[in-house]
Amino acid sequence: MQEKRPTLDGLEQILELIASDPRIQPNFSGWIRASLRSGGGKIRVLRYISDHARSDGAPPQILDVGAQFASLAVYAVKLGYHAAAVDYGPAAKTFQKVASDHGVDYKECDVGAEALPFPDNQFDFVTYTDVMEHHAFSPKRVLREIQRVLVPGGRVIVVTPNHASIYNRLKLLFGGSVNDDFDYFFDVCADERIYDGHHREYTRAELRAALGRTQFQVLECRVFEQDLIPLLHYLRRHRTRGEIFPESRDLFLCALGEIWALLHLPLDRWIWAVGEKTGDGKT
């Protein structure tokens, strides 16, 4: 039976379904389950798609770029959507097999060097969330490809860290760094050919410009904070299992986010943007 509305409980079921697959390595299983902490982002995206789906009732066609273990796409299929996904890396083949078994058209694609493996004008929505900051190259090529595969009037949903957040400003003010942890970058990743952390983060003005320069009409571009509820939901589950969770910092920052929102201050850690393809989308 198909769900009508994305929920946190529904996402948790999807994460457990993927994490418990015997093809998933044990070290990935814990990471997949722990992603529930920030699961509000995926719920936010899926609810946006649900609220802006086609008026004729046809199931929306969605593509998730940088899908990782494809929990968003698998949940989308459960909701009755047609979902595709792309990613690239050592674990992509395993994730592809698992996601394909749940109805997702998952393809390996290096978006920095290859065209998206789909025809023009196919998708109603493309999700491009928590991906841009990991690129060691300009996102221009990727956004142009997203333009190509969207139908006219289709939308891209972008979520990325806010480089101008109050937290980054305070770190710099007190002599800290806004980059990824130095010890992890310098020592743990010393033998890696490609660094998988954040290469470049963006401000709201930069993200708006990136969408505009690739011929998207910017419908939304605002900052937000991760919701408290998914994090509390995750902590409650882990508390019942007797596990220890060092999550007090995230709880504090999420609570502060509620205050910034009430005061209408653009200080939060994340940017949400929606761009619409107009006309033929040629750039």
Task: Name these PLM-found stretches.
Residues 1-2:
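Basic/polar N-terminal segments that are highly enriched at the extreme N-terminus
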Residues 5-40, 98, 108, 114, ...:
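S-adenosyl-L-methionine-dependent methyltransferase catalytic module, highlighting the catalytic core
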Residues 283:
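Short polybasic linear motifs
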